Amino acid sequence: MKSLTVIILYSEREQILEESIQSIWKLNPLEIIILVPNDRRNLYEIAKKNKCHIVLMDKYSTYYEGYEASVKAAKGDVLLFVDSNFSISTNEMKKFIEPVVTNQADVVLNKIDKFVEVGKCPNMDIVWRKMLNEILSRPDLKSNSILSLPYALAKEVVVNIGFDYMKNIVLAHMNIVDQGWRINDQYAIKTLSRDETLEEEGYLVKKELSENEKEKLGKYLIGISKWIEKKGKRVGFTDAGKRRDIVQKLGECKRYPSYHQGWGMHSSIYDGKQLSVIIPVQNEEETIEQVILEARKIEPLEIIVVVNGSIDQTANIAKRLGATIIKYNERLGHNVGRAIGALEATGDILLFIDGDFSVSGSDLHHFTKAVSDGIDIALNDLNPMLNPPFYIVDIVKYMLNLAYDRPELSNGSLVAIPHAMSRSCLDAIGWETLLCPSLAQVKAILEGYRVECVHYVDVVKPNRIRLKENVSQNGHPPAVLRIIGDHVEALSYLIEQLEMDGKGD
């Protein structure tokens, strides 16, 4: 059995503090260390009376300095960190620390996901903790981390992550996971802070971030920035074979392996502006005709169909219906066709749709009209379809919108079709950026372009399920891993532009 040190964060609630100390002594720890501000005489007397080791913090000390001093002073093989604002029974604490004191685990986390009810909306903290574990390829940890008290660490873990780990606890959690320490998160103690239990008014949407939330967000971004610096801009997530090489070559010389010029019309409904419709396709012979017929209803100057990896009649059907055809025999990878279509487009308004299901002309018109009226990126407003439990793809979309302080966009994203874009926005962010939709969205936001969710179109029910991409027996399917990677790539760019990459640290 390993020896135990318990470190208590001081409490303003003196009675609960004393009760907590008495419960903790029943665990037979080597010591109890408590952080006490030197102007809180009553707390000092309680700690002294109960034979605690006291770490005094003067008014110039930071919370982190007090924590570091406590960790350095600890003598036990295991360190248990508790918040004395909550009364925890001896029996609860004994069960909680059992895996680490019996050497079955190196780290014990509070299973807070037990208290985040399925029917409730997770707040910003929960979203970002979930995202951290996704980035670390540990989705099984859900939102559980050392950001929630209580938690317990073997002393050797603390030595490896550094005694000053509280200065960047986000990065510390990431290092714990990366270093392969054995983590147990099977026991739940209900000691959630107000921030952790706070419910948002809507599902993954809020009007604005508070100053406190912005400060927390900065800490998450700084932690992730160091991780990106260590692991690369996609931190190991696949891009599922996107042909970035083809995009690069087209940037140097616009030449397609196969090209057919189609026809269109000069529109009279966009105040003199002209519309290009871009449709990337692969083996969509059963649906492409209806897709094009609906697109014709909104008066496009051109419909550009980018065919890649097809072995059916998709290209011939689209050609018969007057579309401009760009054809590649090989698969280009997700979103590369969008980028190539944008390169070829000549319109003032660009509408992006998919070829595997049709969207009515009346629905499409909401997006093109919004851009005609001055919006630069008109997104599909998917918030009405959100219901708990939330899918990880919706969570990462919301996470990115939080990162650049646009929480009202919810899960609005260039990942989803339909969406439309202004010519000026495309020229500013670059057509090639569209191969990573989330990166394109970040660039547009940072450049000051108007990005709004304008209309709801259900793209879940009609979307064709591709088993190899959308289904997995273990973990996330390939499509989800690619989307997470795209969002991490977008975060990488955002962090670099905000100069939060930590390179000066």
Indicate residue ranges for each PLM-predicted region.
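Acceptor/aglycone-binding surface of glycosyltransferases and processive sugar-polymer synthases
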Residues: K94-A152, H365-R423
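Short, acidic, metal-binding catalytic loop of nucleotide-sugar glycosyltransferases
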Residues: Q22-L30, L293-L301
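Short aromatic/hydrophobic "clamp" motif used to bind/position activated sugar donors
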Residues: L79, L350
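A conserved acidic beta->alpha catalytic loop
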Residues: V36-L43, V307-A315
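Cell-envelope/extracellular polymer assembly enzymes that use nucleotide-activated donors
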Residues: S3-T5, L171, Q274-S276, E302, ...
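C-terminal catalytic/acceptor-binding lobe
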Residues: D178-H266, Y270, L446-D505
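Glycine-rich, basic loop-to-helix element that forms the pyrophosphate-binding segment
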Residues: Y60-A74, Y328-A345
